């Protein structure tokens, strides 16, 4: 049934214009971070020591912001980003631990560095390194997926009609 269906450009455009929220690419942030580990259940002495180390690293960053990546390589305890100078790449909301994400999305300009923040993993220093604003994906980029969706929807409707017709025919006999 679906192979026989043709969806017109006007129908595709109408769907795109009627539901722009479905075709938005969420804002993303690129950040680097330095993690000084102090797991959630760590004792007070471990937490105090980790906070002090994070504060000392932040002081070095404030003295020379260009050293962030170098300081991340030397001090961060995040195995996934340390070798990359703390770079976490671009991420949307919902992809990182809440404290880190809220801080990254709370920074207002590229190059801005946060104060020391705490998460379940320890203490972080976040540097905002990029922002991709929310955008409406271009029609040409989503045209084929809208067409496929409209075809599936129409095929399901036609299939239901055929089943009803078949059921009625069988019932009448």
Identify the residue ranges that each predicted region occupies.
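Short acidic-hydrophobic surface loop/beta-edge motif
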Residues: 113-119
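Short terminal targeting/anchoring segments
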Residues: 105, 168-173
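Well-structured core secondary-structure elements of compact alpha/beta domains
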Residues: 1-5, 17-63, 73-99, 125-170
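Append "and occasionally in soluble cytosolic enzymes with long acidic Gly/Pro-rich linkers
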Residues: 12-15
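Cell-wall glycan
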Residues: 96-109
């Amino acid at each position: 049934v679906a192979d026989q269906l043709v969806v017109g450009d006007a129908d595709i455009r109408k769907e795109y214009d009627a539901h722009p929220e479905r075709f938005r690419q969420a804002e993303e942030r690129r950040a680097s971070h330095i993690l000084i580990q102090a797991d959630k259940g760590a004792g007070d002495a471990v937490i105090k020591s980790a906070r002090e180390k994070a504060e000392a690293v932040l002081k070095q960053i404030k003295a020379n912001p260009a050293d962030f990546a170098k300081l991340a390589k030397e001090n961060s305890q995040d195995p996934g980003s340390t070798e990359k100078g703390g770079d976490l790449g671009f991420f949307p909301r919902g992809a990182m631990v809440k404290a880190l994400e809220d801080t990254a999305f709370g920074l207002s300009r590229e190059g801005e560095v946060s104060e020391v923040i705490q998460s379940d993993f320890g203490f972080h220093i976040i540097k905002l390194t990029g922002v991709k604003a929310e955008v409406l994906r271009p029609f040409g980029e989503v045209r084929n997926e809208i067409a496929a969706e409209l075809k599936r929807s129409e095929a399901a409707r036609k299939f239901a009609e055929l089943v009803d017709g078949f059921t009625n025919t069988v019932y009448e006999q």
